[in-house]
Regions:
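Active-site loop/oxyanion-hole signature of alpha/beta-hydrolase fold enzymes
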Residues: 43-84, 123-126, 270
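Conserved alpha/beta-hydrolase catalytic His-Asp/Glu region
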Residues: 143-200
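Catalytic histidine-centered segment of alpha/beta-hydrolase-like enzymes
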Residues: 256-265
Length: 282
C-alpha cells in the first residue's frame, strides 16, 4: 500500500502532528509552525483533496480521514505524538485519538468543526431532502471561488479588503495566498485545493455523534482553542464539552475567528506550548 502523503517541517523535540483545515493546505500555516519548530518536530498528513488521483465519490463521512492518520502514525513507527488540528483537522485528530489513544500524548483542537447534536440533526435532515448544497453558505462560497489568477499581488490587494481576513497580518495573508495557489505551466496561478473537493467535505461533515458519545471517557489531555468571533465551535458546543468532560480545557481568544491560527500564529503557538509544558509536569 502506498505511503500516506504528508509533509515534514522539521524542528527539534518530541513529534507534533499538525492537520490542516478544509481548503487550507499546510503551507498556509507556516507562521504557526515556525513558532513551534524550536520545541517540536513537526510533520503532518495531507487530507485526501491534496493527494494525486484521490477519489471522493465513495466518501460518505470524515471517518476515513482518521483511518488515514492512524495509518500514517503506524507507518512512521513513532511513539505517542502531540496531535494538533484546525477545523476538520481537529475532528479527524480527535476521532483518531479516541480510536487509538495510546498513539497520542496530547490533543489540541483549533476551533474544531464540532457542532452539538441538534445542529447536526438539522443539517442531516436538510442534506437528506436534497437541499444541502443550496443552503450551506460555505458550499455556495466554494462553488463561486475563483480558480485561476494572473498574479498573486492582485490577489493580495483583493483579499486585503475582505472582512473574513480582518485579523490577519499582511505577512500571514501573503502566506495564506501562497499556500492556496500553485504556478500554472501556461503562466499565472491556480488553486491547489479544488472547489469540488472543498464542497464534498462540507457536504459529508457534521456526522460526529460518535465523538460526543466518546467524550465522557476520553482521557488524553486535550485543549480546545476557539475564537470569540467564531461561527464554528459555538458556545453551546463549549458548554456540552465541559458538561461531558471537565478535564478538557477550553481557551477563548479575543478578536479571533475560525481561522485563528492564521490570525494569531504566535499567540496560538504560545498557548499550545504552555499547555503542553503544564501537562508534561503533571
Amino acid at each position: 500500500m502506498n505511503q500516506i502523503p504528508h509533509f515534514d517541517f522539521g524542528g527539534n523535540g518530541e513529534p507534533l502532528h499538525f492537520l490542516h483545515a478544509n481548503g487550507y493546505p499546510p503551507e498556509c500555516y507556516s507562521g504557526l509552525l515556525e513558532h513551534l519548530k524550536d520545541n517540536y518536530h513537526l510533520f503532518g498528513m495531507k487530507l485526501r483533496p491534496l493527494w494525486d488521483g484521490a477519489k471522493k465519490d465513495d466518501l460518505r463521512d470524515w471517518h476515513p480521514y482518521s483511518e488515514d492518520l492512524l495509518r500514517l502514525l503506524s507507518d512512521r513507527e513513532i511513539g505517542p505524538v502531540i496531535g494538533v488540528g484546525h477545523s476538520i483537522g481537529g475532528i479527524v485528530t480527535l476521532r483518531a485519538a479516541m480510536r487509538e489513544p495510546k498513539r497520542f500524548r496530547a490533543v489540541i483542537l483549533l476551533d474544531p468543526v464540532l457542532f452539538v447534536p441538534s445542529t447536526m440533526n438539522t443539517w442531516n435532515f436538510v442534506r437528506a431532502i436534497g437541499v444541502g448544497e443550496k443552503v450551506h453558505p460555505l458550499i455556495q462560497t466554494a462553488k463561486r471561488r475563483r480558480r485561476e489568477f494572473t498574479d498573486l499581488e492582485s490577489v493580495f490587494r483583493s483579499y486585503r479588503t475582505k472582512p473574513v481576513f480582518r485579523y490577519m497580518s499582511d505577512e500571514s495573508l501573503k502566506q495564506y495566498i501562497e499556500g492556496i495557489t500553485k504556478p500554472k505551466s501556461t503562466g499565472g496561478y491556480e488553486l491547489v485545493y479544488t472547489p469540488e473537493w472543498e464542497t464534498h467535505i462540507y457536504m459529508t461533515g457534521m456526522r460526529d455523534y460518535d465523538l460526543w458519545r466518546g467524550l465522557a471517557n476520553f482521557d488524553v489531555p486535550t485543549l480546545i482553542i476557539r475564537g470569540d468571533e467564531t461561527d464554528t465551535f459555538m458556545p453551546n458546543a463549549e458548554y456540552l464539552v465541559k458538561k461531558k468532560n471537565q478535564k478538557i480545557q477550553i481557551h477563548t481568544m479575543k478578536k479571533a475567528t475560525h481561522i485563528l491560527p492564521l490570525e494569531h500564529p504566535k499567540e496560538v503557538a504560545d498557548i499550545i506550548k504552555d499547555f503542553l509544558t503544564t501537562e508534561s509536569r503533571s
